């Protein structure tokens, strides 16, 4: 026999779980507490097991309650998708796109999105910034229509469109003693320096650890863990250490002479910027238009590194005359 659950009951379950109180759930829904209690009692009678237990005076979902919560989230997401799809059918030229962007991409993604909005002002964009783990979670949960990041994990079934290359380098204070060294610098040499690194879960951190491991210097000593590229740059300029970092995040500082690029063996490591969407995510015309735009024109918004000292190692060959940069397959962002 099919259950007699209602959308209102499932919504009340979600509100009660979030607030830990039927009274607060009633307030949020504009109902009286007795009405909510009656709804929850009817739902528990229908499923035959308790949905909540009281712990320290708060409601906590049981295993059955967690199952209902998961179902409610899926249903709410499906209804939201249906609402957006219907709106797109009524006005195909309009729409909205939720865009997840890894934090390192904020040095070009806003400019690209602004250009897209100028061309398609009728499309609403919502921008969400996070580290690699945050963005992957948003793709898996189907919260994002499009994500701007590096290559997604192989287990994640996704469509990807290439935006452009993404080089990684090591930067240092302009007066660092290593710039006077005649011998070529290796990653192993850097283990004797103070390294400023991103937090675990950051694609830059993952890639840095891979570079050191492949160079035979795993687990490099970390002087400071910093969750912001901006703070890392300021810390390097202040003389606190060296940083393995995206070249796109330091283009302005290198051009202005506030940071210098160390010539390190095996660097730069080049990965790719991609526009990504989950294959399970229904992409409406507005999202498809953004994917097409990023593939076609996204590379033009990538920061350009200066030539000359340091810059020659990661400018394109036709600009710098340098040897090709090292490319790493399946690089994280």
Swiss-Prot record:
Protein name as catalogued: HTH-type transcriptional regulator CbbR
Segments forming domain HTH lysR-type: 5-62
Gene3D superfamilies named among the record's database cross-references: 3.40.190.290, Winged helix-like DNA-binding domain superfamily/Winged helix DNA-binding domain
InterPro entries assigned: LysR_subst-bd, Tscrpt_reg_HTH_LysR, WH-like_DNA-bd_sf, WH_DNA-bd_sf
Physiological role: Transcriptional activator for the cbb operon (cbbLSXFP) for RuBisCO and other Calvin cycle genes. Binds specifically to two binding sites in the cbbR-cbbL intergenic region.
CDD domains named among the record's database cross-references: PBP2_CbbR_RubisCO_like (cd08419)
Pfam families per UniProt: HTH_1 (PF00126), LysR_substrate (PF03466)
Similarity annotation: Belongs to the LysR transcriptional regulatory family.
Organism in which the protein naturally occurs: Xanthobacter flavus
Regions recorded as binding DNA: 22-41
PROSITE patterns, per database record: HTH_LYSR
GO-annotated molecular function: DNA-binding transcription factor activity; transcription cis-regulatory region binding
Keywords on record: Activator, DNA-binding, Transcription, Transcription regulation
Stretches assigned to coiled coil: none
């Amino acid at each position: 026999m099919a259950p007699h659950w209602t959308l209102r009951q499932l919504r009340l379950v979600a509100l009660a779980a979030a607030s830990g109180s039927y009274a607060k759930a009633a307030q949020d829904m504009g109902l009286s507490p007795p009405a909510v209690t009656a709804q929850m009692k009817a739902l528990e009678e229908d499923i035959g097991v308790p949905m909540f237990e009281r712990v320290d005076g708060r409601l906590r979902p049981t295993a059955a309650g967690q199952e209902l919560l998961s179902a409610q989230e899926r249903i709410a997401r499906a209804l939201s998708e249906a609402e957006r799809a219907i709106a797109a059918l009524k006005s195909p030229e309009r729409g909205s796109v939720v865009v997840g962007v890894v934090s390192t991409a904020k040095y070009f993604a806003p400019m690209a999105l602004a250009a897209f909005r100028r061309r398609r002002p009728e499309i609403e964009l919502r921008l969400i910034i996070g580290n690699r783990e945050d963005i992957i979670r948003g793709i898996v949960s189907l919260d994002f229509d499009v994500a701007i990041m590096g290559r997604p994990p192989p287990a994640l079934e996704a469509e990807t469109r290439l935006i452009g290359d993404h080089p990684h380098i090591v930067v240092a204070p302009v007066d660092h003693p290593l710039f006077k060294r005649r011998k070529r610098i290796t990653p192993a040499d850097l283990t004797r320096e103070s390294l400023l690194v991103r937090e675990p879960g950051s694609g830059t951190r993952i890639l840095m650890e891979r570079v050191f491991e492949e160079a035979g210097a795993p687990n490099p000593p970390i002087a400071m863990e910093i969750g912001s590229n901006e703070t890392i740059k300021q810390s390097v300029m202040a003389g606190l250490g060296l940083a393995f970092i995206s070249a796109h995040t330091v283009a302005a500082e290198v051009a202005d002479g506030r940071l210098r690029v160390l010539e390190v063996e095996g660097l730069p490591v080049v990965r790719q910027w991609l526009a990504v969407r989950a294959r399970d995510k229904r992409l409406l015309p507005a999202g498809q238009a953004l994917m097409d735009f990023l593939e076609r024109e996204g590379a033009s918004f990538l920061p350009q590194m200066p030539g000359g000292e340091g810059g020659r190692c990661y400018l394109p060959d036709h600009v710098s005359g340098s040897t090709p940069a090292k490319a790493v397959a399946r690089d994280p962002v």
